[in-house]
Every structure is written in structure tokens, then in C-alpha cells.
């Protein structure tokens, strides 16, 4: 009997607006990784503002999640995709945060609920503005069971030399977190302290991360990169985020990633 590796648990989050980014993330990840269990955190929600107005967000529906699931199972029949509607958990733990008016959507904070959603002992969180170009298991194996609560890339010498932790790619040691209370502290800071980058800074204040290598969160212009970074993070250093422009414009500027569009078209044609 062939022994299969332990599943790689990957968590993503977002509303309907980031679906183009998520499908590119899922496709590019599955091109290089097998035995993956995806966890999508989503919800419908309206955020009420101090001036009496409100902003409504639509979560990714079961039908839309079904399309992401088709991508996953088409590329690897042993992988799976699970949609988690976590509105109840959000209302219970995060809805009264002082950071509701910061301009970030509520979905950025959902990574603070990992210990309440998953029953696994570790997981890898990925933002929706990422393309994966290689194997994600090395950081998952290295830091998922290490003597740290989490691992993240930190920009050297940012923030007056202290370093700025970037929360786009995170390895969580959930087994350790459940007794250390790390995410419980992060939620408390997120709810009470007004931050520029709310959930990211709440995590950093709750505890220092293990050092994730830059190749797993490459934020600079990847057209100028030496070698091939494993994770491309389309931050402000890159021209476009995939989910903020029409896909055609993104792939015209980044023709090296058009294989994603072509691959998704093939999957659509057979389903």
C-alpha cells in the first residue's frame, strides 16, 4: 500500500470580490502541491460606520466555492476544499473591534480565528493576492511543529529597524497555540488597540514570529528576482493585484503567468 503524506492544510479568506485572486492562487498552488485540504473562511456581513452609513460584503457562495473545489479535485483527486461560514464566530469574537473604521475589510481579520475553526494541529494561511511557484511543504514542516506559535516573513530594518511582519503568508502551530493562548491575545489586541494594519499588528504584538524566508513571501518586483521565489505576493511593489483589474490586463503585463488563465479555461471546458 502506498503511504500518502499528511495533508497540507491551507487557509484562505475573502468575499466575492477576491474570487479571481483565489482561483489563481488555488490553481497555481495545486500545480506544485498534492494532498492539500483547503479551508475557505467567508461570510456575508454589513459593517456599520460611525456616520450612520454601512458597507455590505457578500461572502463566497456555495456555488462559487464549488468552482474552487473543482479546480482542486481536477488537479489532484486526493485533495479537498471546505467552505466555512464563520459569521457566528466573527460576531462573537471580532465584531466589536475598534478597528472597524480602518478601511480594511472584515475578512482580513478572519485569520485570527484559526484556533476556533480548524481542528488540525497546524495550518498555512495565504492571502488572495498570491501566486505559488513551488513546494509549500518545507515551511509547513519546519514551523508547523516548532517551538513557535507562528512563522512569518519580516521586512528587515522596516519600522525604524525593528522590522515589519507581513501577514500574507503565515504558518500557524495550532497545537501549541491552543495552550499558549497566542490567538486569544491577538484577538484581544485587535479588539482594543487601534492599528494602522489591524490584524497584522495584533499578531505581532501577541508574539514574535519564527523567521519565514523571503522566498515564501516575495514582495519585490518578481520580474527582477534572482532565481524563482516560491510565493509571489503582489504587494505595492508589483504593478497589479489580480483581483483589482480585469484578468486580461493582469496577464498582458505578466504573460509568464498566463498559464493560470489557460489552465482555468481547460477546467471550465470539461466541467
Give short role names for the model-derived ranges.
Residues 1-18, 24-25, 33-34, 172-271:
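A glycosyltransferase accessory/donor-loop signature
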Residues 37-45:
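Short internal beta-strands
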Residues 48-116:
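Active-site-proximal specificity loops/subdomain of glycosyltransferases
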Residues 106, 166-169, 173:
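Glycine/small-residue-rich pyrophosphate-binding loop that anchors the diphosphate of NDP-sugar donors
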Residues 123:
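Short aromatic/hydrophobic "clamp" motif used to bind/position activated sugar donors
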Residues 126:
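Catalytic metal- and UDP-sugar-binding loop of GT-A-like glycosyltransferases, i.e.
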Residues 130-162:
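Conserved donor-nucleotide/metal-binding helix-loop-beta segment in metal-dependent transferases, i.e.
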Residues 164-167, 227:
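Short, solvent-exposed loop/turn segments at the edges of secondary structure
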